[in-house]
Design a protein with these regions (language model features):
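Compositionally biased low-complexity segments enriched in histidine and/or tyrosine
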Residues: 3-10, 14, 19-29, 62
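Short, glycine/charge-rich flexible loops or terminal/linker lids adjacent to PRPP-binding catalytic cores
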Residues: 391-437, 447, 474-481
Length: 551
């Protein structure tokens, strides 16, 4: 039976006939062949059956028209529209793993809570019970929506991996929610992934030509098929096929692979996505961010290094490098926007980074004003730094409604236009007749910035000076951030003055790249979205960008 809770968001159509039952999801390309095959039993269809068949065809064609009209083919847009009130920029996901800790699934549940900001479309947990069997619970929605006492209690054992997802590649849908679970003659294993594989199209074709059958459109599944294609004796370590598979993958990733005995954790050779190791008693935890460690009572041990494969089992922690080439190129947006302020990334606290960037931003582009206002939530640290450096009061001029932003309703244009007002509200008594320094972490498409500036003016602000605690985003990201084309970026085809006019601010300034390095106390960051210097080859990703400019 189809899980209606999981599939209703993708608009299932249910039809029942007297002699056969149809459960048809209009994503299926085999609908007509299945329908005809099932009706061959009806030698002499009556008038009601003929009418019913024609109604089905009409409904099917209507569904196709709707998908074409709203651009839904292969885009996963229906799922993304649930986040229509959220901030412009989205990161793909967060991963969490537990080894050797009693009630590991429960620990993973709390860990995923702490990583919820990294993905809100779906989540899942796989655990290993006392018999060595892998058990899974996953679904669409927040951690609190997917898990309850009953299904969480069904996940036994002292090993588990979990995942929270936001789709930037492969679209939405329950089939793309991780962890992925794979059956293999050498033993079952589960896989979770944060990042993006830039040569996924080539690898998928390579694997399909050799007989691989994919159960999702997510590029995360590619690693599993690369591992499976190598012969491995049952219950033997998978480290060799894993390392061989990783050398075929290009891009940004933090993977975890869990068998019935051990967990393998690995980062790409550039270190674009974070992954840290913590300890609870005699057991270990792994997380995309260190903020989850304090919640589960873990002590930070170290970060997984770029190009490293860590094996955790009853022998403890063992380490191997899958590539002779390693370099640190942590995604700058992890510090600027994605990570929680209480997380530490490779030795640098996120809040401290953002606050320091705010101070440097004032030094580089100060202007006369009355108050400083940060855009909730990720810009508040930078706003406090700007206010401290300038001596201006740091006011809460914008209030965030935390209960807006998740809906399964396809919104109208009017609802979209009201989206920012529903999520952010100005405090009129604070902003009225004031010259405001409005601090935000970044500008991607500019639509949110424009609406906030207009909102503050409507609330009585005399002037609104926009200050951005990062450089101008001019290039797409192919490493797991939801900005994949040039044309959607405000600053790609505009200079500073044109960007200012587009968002209707009185002035606009961005943090320099040098200021970003100074705030992070490091220069080994990936700034590809700012300066176009991509640390990896781009393969099919750059082909998509070139295709965009053909017209």
């Amino acid at each position: 039976m189809v899980d209606t809770k999981c599939y209703m968001p993708t608009y299932c159509l249910y039809f029942t006939q007297r002699r056969c039952e149809y459960i048809y999801i209009y994503n299926s390309p085999n609908f007509f062949s299945d329908f005809i095959r099932k009706n061959k039993k009806n030698k002499r269809p009556n008038i009601y059956q003929l009418i019913f068949q024609r109604l089905l065809i009409i409904l099917y064609l209507c569904a196709l028209v709707i998908r074409w009209r709203y651009g839904l083919f292969f885009s996963g847009r229906l799922v993304r529209e649930r986040n229509m009130f959220s901030k412009e920029l989205k990161e793909e996901c967060g991963v969490f793993g537990v080894w050797g800790v009693p009630r590991a699934a429960e620990v993973t549940y709390y860990g995923l809570h702490s990583l919820q900001h990294r993905g809100q479309e779906g989540c899942g947990i796989v655990s290993v019970n006392d018999k060595g069997e892998l058990q899974r619970v996953k679904g669409l929605g927040l951690v609190t929506e997917v898990f309850n006492t009953e299904n969480l209690g069904s996940l036994h054992g002292d090993m588990a991996v979990g995942h929270v997802r936001y789709s930037t590649h492969g679209g939405g849908g329950i089939e793309n929610v991780q962890p992925f679970l794979f059956r293999h003659n050498s033993g079952d294993f589960a896989l979770v992934h944060n990042g993006n594989v830039v040569n996924s199209a080539q690898l998928r074709k390579y694997l399909e030509d050799r007989g691989s059958l994919f159960q999702s459109t997510s590029d995360s599944e590619i690693l599993a098929h690369l591992i499976k294609k190598e012969p491995v004796e049952r219950n033997s370590p998978r480290i060799i096929p894993i390392m061989e598979a990783l050398n075929m993958i290009e891009g940004a990733f933090a993977f975890m692979v869990m068998t019935n005995h051990r967990i393998y954790a690995m980062r790409d050779k550039y270190g674009l996505r974070p992954l840290s190791i913590g300890r609870i008693g005699d057991g270990y935890v792994l997380s995309s961010e260190t903020c989850a460690f304090s919640v589960v009572g873990a002590e930070f041990v170290r970060d997984v290094e770029p190009g490293e494969v860590v094996t955790i089992d009853h022998h403890g922690i063992r380490s191997r490098k899958y590539s002779d080439y390693q370099r640190h190129a942590m995604c700058a947006m992890e510090y600027i926007y994605f990570s929680r302020p209480d997380s530490d990334i490779e030795g640098r606290n996120v809040h401290s980074f953002r606050k320091e960037s705010g101070k440097i931003l004032y030094r580089e582009s100060h202007v006369d004003a009355d108050i400083v206002v940060g855009v909730p939530d990720s810009s508040l640290s930078a706003a406090s730094g700007y206010a401290e450096a300038s001596g201006l009061p740091n006011e809460m001029g914008l209030i965030k409604n935390r209960y807006i932003g998740r809906t399964f309703i396809q919104p109208s244009q009017e609802m979209r236009d009201k989206g920012v007002k529903m999520k952010l509200s100005p405090v009129r008594s604070i902003v009225k007749d004031k010259r405001i320094i409005l601090v935000d972490d970044s500008i991607v498409r500019g639509t949110t910035s424009l609406r906030i500036v207009r909102m503050l003016r409507e609330a009585g602000a005399k002037e609104v000076h926009m200050r951005i605690a990062s450089p101008m985003i001019k290039n797409p990201c192919f490493y797991g951030v939801d900005m994949s084309t040039h044309k959607e970026l405000l600053c790609y085809s505009r200079n500073l003055e044109q960007a200012r006019q587009a968002i209707e601010a009185d002035s606009l300034a961005f943090l320099s790249e040098e200021g970003l390095f100074e705030a992070g106390h490091r220069s080994d960051l990936c700034l590809a979205c700012f300066n176009g210097n991509y640390p990896t080859a781009l393969y099919s990703s750059i082909e998509e960008v070139n295709e965009e400019h053909k017209f």
